[in-house]
């Protein structure tokens, strides 16, 4: 047994010391950062891989805002892949492999495709895959005969463009012909791509969106540590997942190291995020195993009780600082996961060495989270829960089994999370705007124009509990 001599600190133990600054406006400050060495973000915020935080809608909103969402793993492989594909199909400049049907297919066929893929229009081709028409939801609106051939209901004489048509030319063609979809074809008239008005408008509305190399929204997905998870990884990567997050509470474990090594060997190009750890040694082990980024945080989350139940963890500021000290030398980003309650905490985490922060409860109350709405005493809330809570574990076992969980299994489980509710907060876009604005204010007080500068220039001062109370509104009635 030994006791470490240093006092471990968390965000409420410190403040950033204001410094002489030449920053004129916080709006000019850059919040660009990296999730992994190959994935750039415009804001350093990641939505947590929790089943009350991130599914399709949250992932889309996060990517559009310049961050990224990590779709949780507590669903079937097929459903998780479907969620990823929905994100990928939400917007893109060119749809490289557009959906198509043949002119000999039926109205029933196209309706099934539209329902399965959330697509509003399907290109129709002949037996040689040459474009001959297009069917949109408008064409199907009053069509009652599901057996009719698409050749009878499709819009013919479709306007097309060459495969190499750029965005400017495509926009001009769409405007000239007053159409919403522009199929791209090769010299033989065969379908090679698709450009839509909807996607062009989204490009302009979200200029800082996080995109992959093909112009699609970026998204991550979580997996477990069982060897069978390699199949899940394969399917997720095939669907276009940009980052694989290995998701267990105690990441500094043999199981985690082995699964990261296996993924790296099987899928060398995959971007792998390991976690969670709370020490420099744990961080280094995951880096040595092949992790491209490391998630730091054992027990700081608002719905996590690991430190109470297991007596294990490291206060989050110290955990981030010590982990970043080893990771930054190797160009590996740190994700500070948990304990973030305010924009000031985001600034402190980045100053301590984190490249991004992962948020759970702060985002669980938004429109885009999959949590259930509840009303209590006239106020609206959404459900939030730790993924190690009793109910989350019961639900997980029910999904993995035959839908039933034995009383013995329930009694044997020791919960390290709680089920809770958080106030309804409206759109995640507004929550992110407030957080990023506060972060930029913190940067200005430390004379930092970039997040890297914030880390380099930051000076922390410790404070007493009285200092913390002084930091909050006091001696007044807050309206």
Set out the residue ranges of the language-model regions.
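Bateman/CBS regulatory modules and CBS-like beta-alpha motifs in cytosolic regions of diverse proteins
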Residues: 25-42, 48-50, 79-119, 124-126, ...
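Glycine-rich phosphate-binding active-site loops on the catalytic face of alpha/beta enzymes
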Residues: 64-79, 241-253, 292-310, 340-374
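Terminal amphipathic helices with adjacent charged low-complexity linkers/tails
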Residues: 73-87, 124, 128-143, 174, ...
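Active-site-adjacent beta->alpha loops and helix N-cap segments on the catalytic face
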Residues: 75-85, 143, 147, 190-210, ...
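Alpha/beta catalytic cores of nucleotide-metabolism and tRNA/nucleoside-modifying enzymes
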Residues: 1-22, 162, 222, 289, ...
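Catalytic beta/alpha-barrel core
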Residues: 71-74, 100-101, 121-123, 160-162, ...
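Short beta-strand/loop segments at the ligand-binding rim of alpha/beta enzyme cores
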Residues: 40-46, 93-98, 212-222, 263-278, ...
